[in-house]
């Protein structure tokens, strides 16, 4: 079965090939017939031209030297001069017209009889009526084609174009690589510069002032307004550390408050920076400002519910040493509570004017109520001052 199929397939292929051969032969025959017809039409056109020349010997034609007059006369089936001759009584002109009409009818097989009067060029001749224009040269920077067009020349020009394109692409790749390398170098150069700027932009830490105060309240009211912005656990201590910031616009003072793990009654308050604004004239809440000289064992009178503003001072007696000293710039202060509920409050120092105000010592005489108390009389109302003075005088009298 397979052999039969193969044989059938071969027969079909042979038949197709034979058909193709026949078609090509018929095409060739048709082309030859067309060429013969063209030769016949050319011969008839040449005979027509000869007849026109002979007719012009008996009857002169008005032939112009330019091509436009020739085409005008040839476009008409009968030249204009023949109509003029027909109006005359010449018998030969009528016969010539009939002869020319017969010749024009015989040449009607051609495409246009207006151009049949002119001899067509022979295909056998190598010369042509139109001159061949030179083909455009291949655009390349390396190879210039001056030879006539041929299959070999086209292959050379195409290879030269490909070589030029390869060179251009290679140059573009190298330029791109160089640009990428430059960009990477610029980025590497800018990164360390940015890091250096960031390091230099860090602000220097301002001086810190630490105070130790015995109090049950963590956030002591010192007259300024504070805003809590964070809290952090302290290592090896059950008490957290709170962070506060001054609420006045443009003031960067910070405060840290934490309770001591060794003595829970002590509150450590650390101030960082200095206030850039005046002290508030009306502090919040009731603030008891208790000042008195340090007596024999540091007992000064105060109510158990009130507390004092931290006022740093270096001049402390041997009986009242500071609990801790933090930085070189920091100042230590102790408010110690006695057995009867009183506080020990050292006086102010000129080295830290932002947290304390100077007060003169209260005397036992009655003139103490008339004595000038400095800035305190502008801040505290008169009732608070009179109450503190009265309590001091009463306790001194008891002693």
From Swiss-Prot:
Residues 1-11, 19-38 have a biased composition (Basic and acidic residues). Residues 1-57, 138-202, 361-399 are annotated as: Disordered. It comes from the Eukaryota. InterPro entries: WRKY_dom, WRKY_dom_sf, WRKY_plant. Residues 215-280 bind DNA. Residues 143-161, 184-193 have a biased composition (Low complexity). GO terms for molecular function: DNA binding; DNA-binding transcription factor activity; transcription cis-regulatory region binding. The keyword Transferase does not apply. One of its GO terms (biological process) is positive regulation of DNA-templated transcription. Keywords: DNA-binding, Nucleus, Transcription, Transcription regulation. Residues 162-171, 383-399 have a biased composition (Polar residues). Disulfide bonds: none annotated. Its main location: nucleus. Signal peptide: none annotated. It holds the Pfam family WRKY. GO terms for cellular component: nucleus. The keyword Transcription applies. It is found in: Nucleus. PANTHER family: WRKY TRANSCRIPTION FACTOR 48-RELATED, WRKY TRANSCRIPTION FACTOR PROTEIN 1-RELATED. Transcription factor. Interacts specifically with the W box (5'-(T)TGAC[CT]-3'), a frequently occurring elicitor-responsive cis-acting element. This is Probable WRKY transcription factor 48. The gene is WRKY48.
